[in-house]
């Protein structure tokens, strides 16, 4: 793991973000060898940690994206982790990679799971509201009020209402509504 990480880092230094710099194709034989070894090391680290991606993806299943889409996004996060991993810091790679994988998946869910995309900061704020609400419900034994949630988050009730309003789901104008003739639509 450490050796593979060092080889990837050497490749990243020689190349520009893992890609051979088109302007400077004149590498020495040793540099070409280092790049080749670095690419193989990157590939080995990616393959060795795909099970981690799948296990993280299963935790986010049912939150707006299919499992395969989550695995794909997690693989992009894993690739970023492989490229940025610094083995000299003493952390295990899987611990480091977990953060990048999870970050990639949560961003994808925030950006792709809704008809109208919410900004990431709003999605994160909404997630923290849900977490505080769950924690308070567990602590109080009942669903907390908006005032209790706002106090726990140290924000105004108006700000809480604003975030919750922006996060409401959308409805299609072609959705049928209960009408006398059975042919009424929301857009009518």
Regions found by a protein language model. Name each.
Residues 13, 110, 123-188:
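Charged, low-cysteine interdomain linkers and short loop/connector segments
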């Amino acid at each position: 793991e450490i050796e593979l990480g060092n080889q990837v880092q050497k490749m990243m230094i020689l190349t520009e973000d893992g890609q051979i710099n088109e302007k400077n194709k004149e590498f020495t034989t040793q540099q070409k060898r280092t790049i080749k070894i670095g690419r193989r090391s990157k590939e080995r680290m990616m393959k060795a940690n795909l099970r981690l991606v799948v296990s993280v993806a299963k935790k986010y299943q049912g939150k707006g994206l299919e499992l395969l889409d989550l695995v794909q996004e997690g693989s992009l996060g894993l690739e970023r982790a492989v490229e940025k991993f610094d083995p000299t810091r003493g952390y295990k790679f899987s611990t480091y990679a977990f953060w990048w994988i999870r970050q990639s998946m949560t961003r994808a869910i925030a950006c792709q799971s809704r008809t109208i995309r919410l900004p990431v900061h709003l999605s994160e704020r909404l997630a923290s509201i849900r977490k505080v609400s769950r924690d308070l419900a567990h602590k109080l034994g009942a669903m907390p009020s908006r005032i209790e949630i706002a106090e726990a988050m140290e924000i105004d009730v108006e700000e809480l209402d604003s975030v919750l309003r922006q996060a409401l789901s959308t409805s299609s104008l072609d959705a049928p509504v209960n009408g006398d003739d059975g042919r009424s639509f929301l857009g009518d």
